[in-house]
Amino acid sequence: MHFVAISINHRTADVTLREQVAFRDDALRLAHEDLYETKAILENVILSTCNRTEVYAIVDQVHTGRYYIQRFLARSFGFEVDDIKDMSQVKVGDDAVEHLLRVTSGLDSIVLGETQILGQMRDAFFLAQNTGTTGTIFNHLFKQAITFAKKAHSETDIADNAVSVSYAAVELAKKVFGKLKSKHAVVIGAGEMGELSLLNLLGSGISNVTIVNRTLSKAKILAEKHNVSYDSLSALPSLLETTDIVISSTSAEDYIITNSMVKTISETRKLDSLVLIDIAVPRDIEPGIDAITNIFNYDVDDLKDLVDANLRERQLAAETIAGQIPEEIDSHNEWVNMLGVVPVIRALREKAMNIQAETMESIDRKLPDLSERERKVISKHTKSIINQMLKDPIKQAKELSTDKKSNEKLELFQNIFDIEAEDPREKAKLEKESRAKEILAHRIFSFE
């Protein structure tokens, strides 16, 4: 059995292509089932987000499994198989495990260390699990990846530092006020940057936000979309008298907020702090305003310095997380190798305990007058002999899990003890066939 991961992401395809190979949420369950019907696929999980579509699969043979996954993607989105090959990357074995761990922990994201992907990966796994397309290996591996990502984020704080301008703007406001929940904010501009700023403000806990825009209808649309208030640009001077935070992103020809405007309202505000954050180029806020008492004015250069510093912090955290991945891969491999050992140990124990049971039956026939107490003592001691005899062979069997020739040596081990253990590969195939029948039956029942 082999682990194959095929990924179409921001490194392998531009956004025009990525838009065409994204599964709708309501189509993902059926997509899991369709891929799972392929004989070469033993387990599968499909991850589909705005920046990546990925198929993770346990396959019987790498070449065949890879082809069927690529064919599945091509048929799903109306491409040729060669097109999918050109826009995707293929990872196999340890490389596939590393890729899964990097993606889940945010190391492969456009925004380094972002946490949204962790939730998306968890949802993808749960959907596959509920659909019935995961088995022993993926049920273990995906839980391991999710646990690893959670631990990595909590131990390194990789996602705590802002690396986008709009998010950094809110972080600057926090540096002045601390908690922002009780504050009032004004966002000037109803474009993309204005909406991003609004979302980051709402995400920080602020609920009292006013959208201000030259075109009132645009402000109204954005405000109603996010359940906040709105006003015209002419209302800005009066809003400045009571607001705490202003984020401006209009790129107007003239300054939206001038020195004279702020001087006028500062007399009304007295000692209340006002944070002005200008993320527009050219600037919306006249330079020099921060010379006025309790007025804090930041422009894009200030934000860039913060973003650059935070990005360096994230990169250091990412290096720490990446350094832990080899250990996780080793842990996974040890677990996988034990899958072949456990049935052998189980078969050895079963044979030994059968011998013990047969011995006790023989004793019962030859010594029928034994008391129940005497029988229990004999049974206990024969089991003890069995366990002591098995101790070293079982230890040797477990050590074979890390041996490069483990399959050959486990076969020899079975021959020596005349046992026949269940083949995990055959077990996986049988489990897959059983789950596939259940999925098919569910489809037929749902259709009827």
Swiss-Prot record:
It catalyses: (S)-4-amino-5-oxopentanoate + tRNA(Glu) + NADP(+) = L-glutamyl-tRNA(Glu) + NADPH + H(+). Belongs to the glutamyl-tRNA reductase family. This is Glutamyl-tRNA reductase. Its EC number is 1.2.1.70. Possesses an unusual extended V-shaped dimeric structure with each monomer consisting of three distinct domains arranged along a curved 'spinal' alpha-helix. The N-terminal catalytic domain specifically recognizes the glutamate moiety of the substrate. The second domain is the NADPH-binding domain, and the third C-terminal domain is responsible for dimerization. The keyword Oxidoreductase applies. During catalysis, the active site Cys acts as a nucleophile attacking the alpha-carbonyl group of tRNA-bound glutamate with the formation of a thioester intermediate between enzyme and glutamate, and the concomitant release of tRNA(Glu). The thioester intermediate is finally reduced by direct hydride transfer from NADPH, to form the product GSA. Catalyzes the NADPH-dependent reduction of glutamyl-tRNA(Glu) to glutamate 1-semialdehyde (GSA). Keywords: NADP, Oxidoreductase, Porphyrin biosynthesis. InterPro entries: 4pyrrol_synth_GluRdtase, 4pyrrol_synth_GluRdtase_dimer, 4pyrrol_synth_GluRdtase_N, GluRdtase_CS, GluRdtase_dimer_dom_sf, GluRdtase_N_sf, NAD(P)-bd_dom_sf, Shikm_DH/Glu-tRNA_Rdtase. Homodimer. SUPFAM superfamilies: Glutamyl tRNA-reductase catalytic, N-terminal domain, Glutamyl tRNA-reductase dimerization domain, NAD(P)-binding Rossmann-fold domains. The active site is at residue 50. Substrate binds at residues 49-52, 109, 114-116, 120. It holds the Pfam family Shikimate_DH. The keyword NADP applies. It comes from the Bacteria. GO terms for biological process: protoporphyrinogen IX biosynthetic process. Gene3D superfamilies: Glutamyl-tRNA reductase, N-terminal domain, NAD(P)-binding Rossmann-like Domain. GO terms for molecular function: glutamyl-tRNA reductase activity; NADP binding. NADP(+) binds at residues 189-194. Pathway: Porphyrin-containing compound metabolism; protoporphyrin-IX biosynthesis; 5-aminolevulinate from L-glutamyl-tRNA(Glu): step 1/2.
